């Protein structure tokens, strides 16, 4: 609980109160057990793929190094989805001999989701979902994984680029403190993986 609160407080600038409760018995199993297969996933690496320049460079660096990454994408609106699709298609065309692929999930929350509570009009907390999706994909590999979150070091440090981009108006998605809390969280819940920004010093 405290680790999760620290991560979300820092990411969003809000102050979170988090509680846990037992899952009802009828939801004891929330996912079907995967059938056995003789074909193991071909992926040897895992990287978030937002459709931005840094995530594209991250994918290219892996592919140029001979890796077979699983790229993980999340989108909430059409423009982002289009950019991701075009870039992924370009990568597939250029690296046609590679078996790399993409896990892509779209998710938005409509108005009135919680009665009497206004909808969130920012995307400050969006990266928590993005990281969680990447970690979910990593656990499916059945071994220790490193989720790469490519972002240039200056942006990761949350330096205000103009007078308006201060505090909660600017992203903390890849700030070293936030990513360290994610690694604390993974250790606390027993997930054999880590998140890492390969360009933290670039």
Language model features: what each stretch is:
Residues 7, 11-45, 55-202:
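Nucleotide-activated chemistry modules centered on ATP-dependent adenylation/adenylyltransferase
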Residues 49:
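Phosphate-binding P-loop/Walker A region and its immediate neighborhood
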Residues 1-2:
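N-terminal accessory alpha/beta regions
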Residues 52:
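Conserved G/P- and acidic residue-centered "switch" motifs that form tight phosphate/ATP-binding loops
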């Amino acid at each position: 609980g405290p680790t999760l609160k620290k991560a979300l407080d820092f990411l969003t600038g809000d102050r979170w109160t988090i509680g846990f409760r037992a899952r009802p018995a009828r939801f004891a199993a929330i996912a079907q057990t995967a059938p056995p297969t003789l074909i193991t996933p071909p992926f040897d690496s895992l990287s978030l793929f937002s459709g931005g320049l840094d995530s594209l460079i991250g994918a290219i660096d892996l592919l140029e190094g001979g890796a077979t990454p699983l790229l993980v994408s999340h989108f909430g609106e059409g423009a982002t989805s289009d950019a991701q699709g075009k870039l992924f298609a370009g990568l597939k065309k250029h690296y046609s001999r590679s078996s790399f692929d993409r896990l892509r999930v779209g998710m938005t929350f409509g108005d009135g989701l919680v009665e009497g509570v206004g909808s969130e009009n920012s995307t400050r907390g969006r990266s928590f979902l993005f990281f969680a999706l990447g970690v979910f994909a990593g656990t499916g590999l059945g071994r220790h994984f490193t989720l790469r979150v490519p972002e240039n070091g200056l942006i990761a440090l949350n330096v205000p680029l103009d007078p308006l981009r201060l505090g909660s108006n600017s992203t903390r998605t890849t700030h070293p403190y936030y990513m360290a809390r994610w690694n604390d969280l993974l250790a606390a819940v027993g997930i054999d993986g880590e998140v890492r920004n390969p360009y933290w010093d670039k």
